[in-house]
Every structure is written in C-alpha cells, then in structure tokens.
Amino acid sequence: TYQGLGERRPVLFNSWEGCYFDFDTARILAYIDASRKIGTELFVLDDGWFGARSDDSRGLGDWWVNKEKVDLHKVMAHCKELGMKFGIWFEPEMVDFDSDLFRAHPEYTLGWKEGRTELTLARHQFHLDFACDAVVENIYAQMKAFLEEYHVDYIKWDYNRTVAEHFSNALPPERQGEVYHRLVLGYYRLIGRLTAEYPHIMFEGCASGGGRFDLGTLYYCPQIWCSDES
C-alpha cells in the first residue's frame, strides 16, 4: 500500500506535450527550472528516456536508461536541489518489434506462433503475453533493476493499445478462453510485487488517459491519469 495515502498530492508537471521524444539533459533541466517557477512539486519525465526510443516505433520492452540521451542521475539530483520530487513513465505490458526484448524473445508477444507472418500492430507496438510467468518475471526484473538504481517518487504506468490476437503460448488450447483473465492477473501480479516492495512510490494508472479505471487498478494505483487532454 502506498505510504502517502493521507498526504496532499503534489502539483505535477509532465514533460510529454512539451517535447515528446525530442529532449536531452539540458532541455529537461530547463523544463524543471521553468516548472518550479510556476509551483510544480513533482516533475515527471514521460516517454523517450529508455532503450533506443527516438520515436514511438522502437524501444518498448527495453527498460534501461539511454545514457547517451539523458543523464537521469543529474536530472533527479537537480529536482532534489530544488525541493521537488521526480517521477518516470513506463508502459510495462507492451513491446516494439524494433526492441532488444522482441529480438531475443518474440515468443513473449501475445499471439506469437512460429511460422506466423504478422501480428496486429497498434501504435507501432505489440502486447506482451502477461499470461506467461516468464514474461512478467522479465519485466519485473528490468523494472526492479531500474528502481534499485534510480530512487524515483512516482511512476506513471501507461497502457496504450487494445488486445488483438487472443492467444497465449502459456495456455493449452482448451484454456485459450482464459487469456483476457490471465493477462489481467499477470498485470496485477507485477504491479502488486512492485507496490509492495516500493511502498514509498506513488503509482499512477494511465491507459491513453482514463481507459483502465477498474477497482483492481485502483487498489494498486491511488491516482489515475483521467484524461490525456489534461
């Protein structure tokens, strides 16, 4: 359970609409300075900080900091110097075709079968098979490694596409009807472990805005990004 449930929520500034993927350390530091002047208490670095994520067609699934693009330790230290908290964006349930994770484990993708020539793309991304324990464990290990090095105060947990191929390699044919249910259980299992291990981090749920507002999500995410128009 998030330790700060009884506290007033900080005023949040999110980097996304201001720069999208086009940023470096200097630009983010300038955003932090400007946002502090207008009363921001929590600065959130959105999409674009990880892997080879120069646009929305690559990098999802590779949750390591792109140090050639941004010095995240410097960014976080600057926030602390100004008395601000720091947050980061993740989309743990998705993967791009152009990613280290997909190249190493295409079978982690929902609907993947040997010999299949194509999967349904949405926003240039595929859905990971969270019905499979190995997939959940891989993403957990990546996120935990990040959180052990970068002590963030907030995570924006995003989810930006629908489920298309309703097939899991983790389930036998007679249980494929359970795919939706098992995907959700995998999501709960991952976010449950992380919120238990890092109770000081506020997890905010997002799904292209308020697209995932179920009671299970609210159990783990005491705050929801209600609309991408905000």
Language-model region placement:
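Aromatic-lined carbohydrate-binding/catalytic grooves of carbohydrate-active enzymes
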Residues: G4-N138, K144, Y154
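Active-site neighborhood of glycoside hydrolase catalytic domains
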Residues: N66-H73, H78-E81, R103-S230
